Each structure stands twice: as structure tokens, then as C-alpha cells.
UniProtKB/Swiss-Prot annotation:
HAMAP family: PSII_PsbD_D2 (MF_01383). Keywords: Acetylation, Chlorophyll, Chloroplast, Chromophore, Electron transport, Iron, Magnesium, Membrane, Metal-binding, Oxidoreductase, Phosphoprotein, Photosynthesis, Photosystem II, Plastid, Thylakoid, Transmembrane, Transmembrane helix, Transport. Signal peptide: none annotated. This is Photosystem II D2 protein. The modification N-acetylthreonine is found at T2. Photosystem II (PSII) is a light-driven water:plastoquinone oxidoreductase that uses light energy to abstract electrons from H(2)O, generating O(2) and a proton gradient subsequently used for ATP formation. It consists of a core antenna complex that captures photons, and an electron transfer chain that converts photonic excitation into a charge separation. The D1/D2 (PsbA/PsbD) reaction center heterodimer binds P680, the primary electron donor of PSII as well as several subsequent electron acceptors. D2 is needed for assembly of a stable PSII complex. Coiled coil: none annotated. It catalyses: 2 a plastoquinone + 4 hnu + 2 H2O = 2 a plastoquinol + O2. It comes from Oryza sativa subsp. indica (Rice). Chlorophyll a PD2 binds at H198.
Length: 353
């Protein structure tokens, strides 16, 4: 009995191979398979944002001016969220709300859902791009894994939080001042600064900035003198065969400063990766909790004592009162459709608070 072994011949012009060859070709700007998701979504997200901030009003959704055309500047322009009455509608241009009318679609806040969803997929495409390139040049995928932190924050804040609330209306609008207002909203309605997940997020981001500054300064301080160049950047010569800086010297320096120091480059750099990414993920988890209206720390005993004793006050009780002021002022402004009416004595008085 004879068994013939051989390869199955593929067509020379196989469509997949042609596309793979073109997409992954070495060019100035790598495209790749991930680019099929990244580039269109990033183009539409940025294009929608520039269009909205330039031309589109928020009068119909928030009663606000939000475009350059209406007199806003870069800090005050925004692509605003849809009205609360539209709940979690995807607001498709051809959907029942806009019915194919582009002007009506913009007035209803359709650009916000357009930018948010395309932006989320663009970020995912960018992470896939890092996976794809890492595989192509045989690198570990830690860059892509690290980028999951910003993606988690974006998705939790712009998508999951409003999904847990009554509609997209309660998500942040895409603008600088709009984001600031959302932060104030988070503080007033969720006491966000006292949330342990926010604390871990702040520790991660600021700790990463500190680590980055210390690491950069230490490397600069311990660069080898490898030539007669006039400046520090001589040491960045890519043809240099040996390592650029002295880990031993850096370890000795920080051992004397703190009593402890990293003695292993891999552990040092993993720690620099771990701190900010963990901080971002903790913040994202905290925002998911807020979507479900989970509360931050409540020191009820201090609130009760402050209510009983006018002379007893802590920074916590002062902040609780400030949060009440934010809620009283913001709720009526942001949700006029609720017809919220607060007695005059509980409302802040002008700029005096």
C-alpha cells in the first residue's frame, strides 16, 4: 500500500494572501488588519467631534451654546449628550428619532453616540494594532496590555456609567469644560473623591508620574561618558554596543537615599507598568460601581454628631454640605424636564455660596 504525501496547492491569487500582503507591508505608516478597525473609526470619531464643536448647538438637549459658530472657544465647545428623554437609544441617523434627517439628528444629540461608539472601537483598534505590531517584530505584548487601562476608563465613564443611569444624558459631553462639569457632578452626586477606587486611581496616576520623573532623572544621572560629545544626548548613539547607563551606580544612590532600591531592571520596569495601569483599572471599576449607584465611604457618626452639635465640624461634614449645594444647584439646571423645585433657603446665593 502506497501513501502519497504532498501539499495542497493554493490558488496563486488567493484574496486573503493579497490583502495580508498589502495590509502588513512595511511602509511609513503601518496599516495592518487592525487598521481596518482603527483608521475608519478614528476618522469618524475625530471628524464627528470637529463637526459638532464647530457647527452643532446643544440648545435642544441641554439649553446651551456649545459650538464655535455660537461663540464658544476650544475650552467651552463640546459635543453634548442626547436629551434625557432619549434614554439609551443608539440614535442611528436612519432610526425612528431622526428618520434620516441629518439636521434633526444633530439637534437630538446623535453626534455624541456617533463619536462615543466610534471612539471606543478606535481605541480597541489601537490596542489591536499594538498586538499586531508586537507579533510582527517578535515583542512581548505588554504595550497593548497596558493600553487596556485607558480603554477601561473610557468605556466605564462614557458607556457603562450612563448605561447604569437613566440615559446617555448623564455621560460626559465631549469637551474640556463639559468634562470639568461632569467631574463636579460626580463629586456632588456620588462623593467621588471619597471613593476608595478613586483614591487608588489617583495613587496610580500620580505615583506613575513620580516614578517616571525619578526613573528619567536617574538614567540621565548615570549615563556613561562614551564620547567627547558636547551634550548628554551623545549617549543616545544607537551604535553603542554596551548598556547606556549604570544600574549599579543608580542602585547604590537610591539605596543610600531610601535604604532600599530596585536591583533588577525587569522588576523596576514592570513596577512602572503596574502602578499606572492598576490605578486606571481601579478607577474604571469604581465608575462601574457608580453606574450601579454604589456609595463611597459614609461616616454617619460624624454627620449625626455635626447635626446635634453646631460646634462640631470636620472636613468630611463640610464636604457633605458642599455636595448638597452642588446637587441643589446642578439638578435644577441640568434636569429642567424634572421640574425640580428647591426652597429658597437651601439654594446657594449667587457666587457667595
Amino acid at each position: 500500500m502506497t501513501i502519497a504525501l504532498g501539499r495542497v496547492t493554493k490558488e496563486e491569487n488567493d484574496l486573503f494572501d493579497i490583502m495580508d500582503d498589502w495590509l502588513r507591508r512595511d511602509r511609513f505608516v503601518f496599516v495592518g488588519w487592525s487598521g481596518l478597525l482603527l483608521f475608519p473609526c478614528a476618522y469618524f470619531a475625530l471628524g464627528g467631534w470637529f463637526t459638532g464643536t464647530t457647527f452643532v448647538t446643544s440648545w435642544y438637549t441641554h439649553g446651551l451654546a456649545s459650538s464655535y459658530l455660537e461663540g464658544c472657544n476650544f475650552l467651552t465647545a463640546a459635543v453634548s449628550t442626547p436629551a434625557n428623554s432619549l434614554a439609551h437609544s443608539l440614535l442611528l441617523l436612519w432610526g425612528p428619532e431622526a428618520q434620516g434627517d441629518f439636521t434633526r439628528w444633530c439637534q437630538l444629540g446623535g453626534l455624541w453616540t456617533f463619536v462615543a461608539l466610534h471612539g471606543a472601537f478606535a481605541l480597541i483598534g489601537f490596542m489591536l494594532r499594538q498586538f499586531e505590531l508586537a507579533r510582527s517584530v517578535q515583542l512581548r505584548p505588554y504595550n497593548a496590555i497596558s493600553f487596556s487601562g485607558p480603554i477601561a476608563v473610557f468605556v466605564s465613564v462614557f458607556l457603562i456609567y450612563p448605561l447604569g443611569q437613566s440615559g446617555w444624558f448623564f455621560a460626559p459631553s465631549f469637551g474640556v469644560a463639559a468634562i470639568f462639569r461632569f467631574i463636579l457632578f460626580f463629586q456632588g452626586f456620588h462623593n467621588w473623591t471619597l471613593n476608595p477606587f478613586h483614591m487608588m486611581g489617583v495613587a496610580g496616576v500620580l505615583g506613575a508620574a513620580l516614578l517616571c520623573a525619578i526613573h528619567g532623572a536617574t538614567v540621565e544621572n548615570t549615563l556613561f561618558e562614551d564620547g567627547d560629545g558636547a551634550n548628554t544626548f551623545r549617549a543616545f548613539n544607537p551604535t553603542q554596543a554596551e548598556e547606556t547607563y549604570s544600574m549599579v551606580t543608580a542602585n547604590r544612590f537610591w539605596s543610600q537615599i531610601f535604604g532600599v532600591a530596585f536591583s533588577n531592571k525587569r522588576w523596576l520596569h514592570f513596577f512602572m507598568l503596574f502602578v499606572p495601569v492598576t490605578g486606571l483599572w481601579m478607577s474604571a471599576i469604581g465608575v462601574v460601581g457608580l453606574a450601579l449607584n454604589l456609595r463611597a465611604y459614609d461616616f454617619v457618626s460624624q454627620e449625626i454628631r455635626a447635626a446635634e452639635d453646631p460646634e462640631f465640624e470636620t472636613f468630611y461634614t463640610k464636604n457633605i454640605l458642599l455636595n448638597e449645594g452642588i446637587r441643589a444647584w446642578m439638578a435644577a439646571q441640568d434636569q429642567p424636564h424634572e421640574n425640580l423645585i428647591f426652597p429658597e433657603e437651601v439654594l446657594p446665593r449667587g457666587n457667595a455660596l
